[in-house]
């Protein structure tokens, strides 16, 4: 009887392992299939150099994406990009974030080619570019933050 019970436990264990593997495979398959449409599911940061400076030039950042890229998603994506790309241990970082109040909190893309206006834009640069960042932020009357 003990061997029959052990066989049942092994069989149940194999079922759980197989179910876990199927779930992992389903998640990986979903990630593979949506890789092509990544920006539809996530916010993607777009950037533009403010001026032609050498290394570490100040940037204008904004985020675009699909239905999940509302103003909250845009703000999170921009802040993540600032903290990943600019290291305050190397040199102090200055940035500001400007909200476009004409854009609704939840705004969906108009069509594939046109994602609409961004809800937030940001100007960011290192301390050596502080004049450029402060000038860009002042044109929107935005507060400059320091990291």
Curated annotation (Swiss-Prot):
Gene for this chain: LIP1
Q: Where in the cell is it found?
A: Endoplasmic reticulum membrane
* Superkingdom as given in the UniProt entry: Eukaryota
How does this chain sit within the bilayer?
A: Single-pass type II membrane protein
Source organism of the structure: Kluyveromyces lactis (strain ATCC 8585 / CBS 2359 / DSM 70799 / NBRC 1267 / NRRL Y-1140 / WM37)
List the stretches on the Cytoplasmic face of the membrane. 1-9
Q: Where are the transmembrane segments?
A: 10-30
Q: What is this protein called?
A: Ceramide synthase subunit LIP1
A GO-annotated cellular component: endoplasmic reticulum membrane
The family annotation for this protein states: Belongs to the LIP1 family.
What does it do?
Answer: Component of the ceramide synthase complex required for synthesis of ceramides.
Q: What GO biological process terms are annotated to this protein in UniProt?
A: lipid metabolic process
Question: Which regions face the Lumenal side of the membrane?
Answer: 31-147
- What UniProt keywords apply to this chain's record, in alphabetical order? Endoplasmic reticulum, Lipid biosynthesis, Lipid metabolism, Membrane, Signal-anchor, Transmembrane, Transmembrane helix
């Amino acid at each position: 009887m003990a061997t029959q019970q052990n066989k049942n436990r092994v069989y149940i264990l194999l079922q759980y392992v197989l179910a876990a593997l199927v779930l992992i495979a389903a998640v990986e398959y979903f990630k593979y299939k949506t890789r092509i449409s990544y920006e539809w599911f996530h916010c993607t940061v777009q950037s533009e150099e403010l001026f032609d400076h050498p290394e570490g030039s100040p940037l204008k950042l904004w985020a675009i994406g699909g239905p999940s890229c509302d103003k909250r998603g845009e703000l999170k994506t921009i802040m993540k990009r600032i903290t990943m790309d600019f290291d305050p241990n190397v040199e102090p970082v200055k940035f500001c974030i400007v909200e476009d109040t004409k854009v609704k909190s939840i705004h969906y893309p108009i069509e594939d080619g046109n994602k609409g206006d961004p809800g937030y834009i940001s100007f960011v640069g290192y301390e050596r570019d502080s004049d450029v960042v402060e000038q860009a932020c002042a044109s929107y009357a935005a507060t400059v933050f320091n990291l």
